[in-house]
Structure formats: C-alpha cells, structure tokens
C-alpha cells in the first residue's frame, strides 16, 4: 500500500470538472507558487471570521488580572480579594471552557459545522453582557465576586466551544500546503488579544486619571473594568452574522455521506488529487442543463423527457443522500469509539490530550498569575496611589506581551510548513523548560533586566512551540468525521491543566515557594516533549486519505474487495 502522496508530488488535474463554490473557497491550482504564509483574500476573510474567538480568549485571559486588582479597590478598599473567590474568578472561564469544548466539539461532528457555528459566539456575547451588569452596589463584596465568577463560567463555555469549531471550519476549507499556516494565523489572534487587552487597560486608565488621581474618586474604577470587559463585544458582534451564515464545507458533507468504505485505488487517487485543492463549500451547484435554454430556443420533447428523468434521478439521489446523513448521525458515537479503540489512533489522541494538558499547566500557571512576574520586574503596583498601581500593572503586562508573546506566534507562522509541527513542538517544550529552569534556579538572584530577558524568551518559546502546535495537531491529524470531537477532547484536557494551575498556584507558592512551583512547570515541559513522540508529523498529510487507505486495507484483509 503506497503512502499518501505529498501535495507537491500530486499529479496535475487539468480535466477537473467545474465546481461552484462559496465565496470562502480558495481553489488551489497546481501551478500556484505562492509562499505558504501569503494568504489569499478568501483565506484572510476566513481568518477574520475564525480568529475572533481566540482574540477574545486571550483578551479575557489577560484582562482578568487587572480587573481583579480593580475589584480590590471597588469592593475591599484596596485589600486583597479572598483567595478562594479570586481563584474561582480566574478559573471560571477555564471551567466553562472544558464544558464548551466537549459539547461543541461533539455537536460539530454530529449536527454539522453550519448548524452549530456562531452559537458559541452568541453565548460569549450573552455572558459578557451579564458580566458587565454585575450589581456591585446592591450585592455584598463576596456576592459580587460570585456573580462575576458564574458569568465567567458561561463565558468560558462559549470561548471553549470556539476551539473545536474554528479549528474544524478552517481545516475543512484549508489547502494542504497552507493548512498549518492558516491555523497558526488563527491561533496568533491570542497574541493580539493579550496585546490589545494590555493596551486598552492603559488607555482607559489614562481617561480616568483626573477622576481617580486628582478628585480621589477611587470607586470610579468600577467604570474602568466594565468598559474594559465590554470592549470585547465589538469584535464579537462584528463577526456574528458571518459565522451564522457560513455554509457547510464540501469536505464535511463528503465525510458524512454514509459508511461506504473506499474500495478501489481510483477513489484514493481522487482524494490525493483533491488534497492540493481547497475542499471548499459546494452549496451553490448549478446543473449544466441550466445553460441549454439561455439562447431562447425551444427544447425538443426528447430532451424534455431526458430532463424529467434527470430531475427524478436527482431527487432520488438527494433522498439517498439525506438517508446516508441520517444513518451517519445515528452511528457517529459508535464509529467514534470504534475508531479510537485501535491503539494506532488512541495513542495519537493520548498524545494530543496529554501534551495540551502539560503545556497549559505551565503556560496558564505563569500567565494567570503574572503578578508574581510583575513583582520581579518592578511593575506589580505595590506602591503609590490606586491609579498609579493599576497603571504600572498595565505597563508591565504590555511589556511582557510585546517582548515574547506576539513574536513567537509569527515565527511559527513563517516556519511551520518548513520545520513541521513535531519539531516545533519538541524544541518549544525543551527550550521553555530551559528558561523555566533558569528562572527557578536563579529566581532570587537574577537582576531585573536578566529576569525580563529570560521571561521574554520563555513566552517566545511557548508560542514558537507547543502553545501553537497543540492547537494545530488535533485539527490536522484526525479525519474530518471525528475532527471536532477529538479537537474538543484535546482542548478540554488542556483547559483542565489551566484549571489545576489557576487553583493550585497561589496555595502551592505559599507552601513551597515560587521557585519550587517553577520546577514543577519545568517537569511538565520535559514530559510534554516526551509525549510528543507519540504523534506523527502531519505536514503534507491528509488525514482523510489516511483514513480511506485504512478502510481499504481493512476491506482487503477481510476479503471483501472484488478481485
């Protein structure tokens, strides 16, 4: 059995019949020599639709730290928030994300991308409005924090649902040559979300400087955090309609046509030819017969009869197609477990889930508790007026984001189709472990400039590494019919790691010290590099072709192929 052809070696398909595709489809011709990181207009449009969820995810992640500090002044007169409630607020979105990733991932495979896509964004909008309506003046301080935490769980369900949805929608439409680049571009919106969150904090605080600093109205910080949270509604509303009206992709429709196995070499070769072309969306199919009457001539009776027969055949085909889809839905749960009951598939799922879990223990452990880092570099806001403290924290967050966060994503975009996902993930884990080891071993000895440099490199190799590739891997390694479910499971395991960090970091750092916690993160990164060895390289690999060949091999082994 020959392995799947690399896209660069796929035979030309000059006689490909005309297809009618949605305005988001990018038809990739064999002679296209565009660099992988240069996107077409349609790919940029898809990037805008799918990327907003990750922008909102990072925006929410990085504003929760300054928001929590603002709530100290609004609710507790500048005293620290109760540790349990503070952890609940920070972990709330991640708790919801686990639910959303499981639920939306399975639903996207079962009901279809079109039926589900956009609902997660509606949930984000609804939860954001609920958050900014927190009645801090009517509830007790603890009651206000509980209100906020509950709405953040709902917000997390929507944000979590966006992971498998956007990954599947993009991968279903991606050209094989630029699939990793497109997914990396989408995920890079996390970098911009954190950057804009830090910048927005500074700008809003500057607008409130006279009120808080000169007039001494510290309680007005209540308006600052509500505006900061509410700004996320702008990109959410801006892309909602596009998501709700996005057609179903051809790749998904083809994958759900039933359980007919691939039984001949020609079918597999056709899949290989299509691997270079964007599968796109074929909702707008125009029959060739529609052109026969465009010149105003009368159709002969014999042709009319043939047309009637064609219409009847088309109706019968549509009926069979609907029956196939119904059968596919009915059997989806069984097929999913049957597919992952094989060790060759299960070990890949274990690899994607475990790597994402280990990454997020370290990544979110650092980024949900940036106050520890800001303290080391002198931007923790430990002195001065309330406004000065908040402004210092905002500047510190901006420095951290600009130095390592955004650059790491774009180095991945430029190199992912050259270096491959596996190499980037392993080196990212190992180099992140290196800088975690330096920070842990010299935590109290490093000068401020040295600490900033080490932390910037740590963030850089998180993002030019496992933080990006753990998102790409489940979308690229599993076939279309199981893609969203497997991606949702992998992402949920990652968020479980984030929850562990959010709830355990503060208490652990007080018991055993921050350097010891950083050594734990070091161990997570080393283990992540080891579990990456379970994963295949997916550059130039079409999982639907692999799945089709596996089906064909199964049929051949069991003697069901015609000889």
Where are these regions (language model features)?
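Transmembrane-helix signature of 12-pass secondary carriers
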Residues: 1-563
């Amino acid at each position: 059995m020959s392995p799947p052809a690399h896209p660069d070696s796929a035979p030309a398909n000059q006689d490909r019949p005309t297809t009618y595709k949605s305005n988001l489809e990018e038809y990739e011709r064999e002679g296209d020599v565009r660099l992988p990181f240069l996107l077409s207009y349609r790919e940029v449009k898809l990037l805008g639709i799918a990327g907003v969820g990750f922008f909102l995810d990072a925006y929410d992640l990085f504003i929760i730290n300054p928001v929590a500090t603002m709530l100290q002044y609004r609710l507790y007169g500048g005293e620290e928030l109760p540790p349990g409630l503070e952890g609940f607020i920070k972990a709330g979105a991640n708790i919801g994300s686990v639910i959303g990733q499981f639920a939306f991932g399975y639903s996207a495979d079962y009901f279809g991308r079109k039926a589900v896509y956009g609902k997660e964004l509606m949930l984000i909008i609804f939860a954001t409005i609920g958050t900014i309506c927190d009645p801090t003046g009517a509830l007790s301080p603890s009651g206000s924090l509980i209100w906020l935490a509950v709405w953040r769980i709902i917000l997390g369900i929507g944000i979590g649902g966006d992971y498998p949805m956007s990954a599947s929608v993009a991968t279903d439409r991606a050209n094989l040559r630029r699939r990793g680049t497109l997914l990396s571009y989408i995920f890079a919106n996390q970098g911009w979300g954190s950057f804009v969150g830090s910048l927005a904090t500074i700008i809003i605080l500057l607008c409130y400087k006279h009120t808080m600093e000169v007039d001494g109205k510290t309680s007005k910080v209540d308006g600052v955090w509500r505006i900061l949270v509410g700004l996320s509604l702008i990109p959410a509303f801006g892309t909602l309609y596009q998501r709700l009206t996005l057609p179903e992709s051809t790749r998904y429709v083809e994958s759900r046509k039933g359980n007919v196995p691939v039984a001949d070499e020609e079918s597999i070769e056709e899949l290989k030819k299509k691997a270079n072309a964007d599968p796109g969306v074929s909702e707008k199919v125009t029959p060739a017969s529609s052109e026969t009457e465009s010149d105003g001539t009368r159709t002969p009776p014999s042709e009319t009869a043939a047309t009637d027969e064609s219409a009847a055949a088309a109706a019968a085909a549509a009926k069979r197609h609907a029956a196939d889809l119904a059968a596919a839905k009915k059997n989806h749960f069984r097929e999913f477990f049957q597919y992952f009951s094989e060790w060759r598939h299960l070990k890949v799922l274990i690899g994607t889930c475990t790597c994402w879990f280990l990454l997020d223990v370290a990544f979110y452990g650092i980024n949900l508790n940036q106050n520890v880092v800001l303290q080391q570099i002198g931007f923790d806001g430990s002195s001065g007026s309330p406004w000065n403290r908040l402004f210092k924290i905002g500047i510190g967050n901006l420095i951290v984001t600009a130095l390592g966060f955004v650059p790491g994503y774009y180095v991945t975009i430029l190199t992912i189709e050259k270096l491959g996902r596996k190499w980037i993930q392993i080196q990212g884990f190992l180099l992140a472990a290196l800088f975690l080891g330096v920070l842990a071993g010299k935590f109290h000895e490093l000068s401020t400039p040295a600490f900033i440099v080490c932390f910037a490199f740590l963030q850089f190799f998180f993002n030019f590494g496992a933080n990006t590739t753990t998102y790409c891997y489940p979308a690229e390694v599993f076939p279309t019919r199981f893609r969203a479910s497997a991606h949702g499971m992998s992402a949920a395991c990652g968020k479980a790691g984030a929850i562990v960090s959010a709830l355990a970091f503060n208490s652990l750092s007080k018991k055993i010290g921050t350097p010891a916690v950083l050594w734990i993160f070091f161990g997570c990164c080393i283990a992540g590099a080891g579990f990456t060895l379970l994963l295949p390289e997916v550059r130039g690999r079409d999982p639907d072709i692999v799945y089709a060949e596996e089906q064909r091999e199964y049929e051949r082994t069991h003697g069901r192929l015609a000889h």
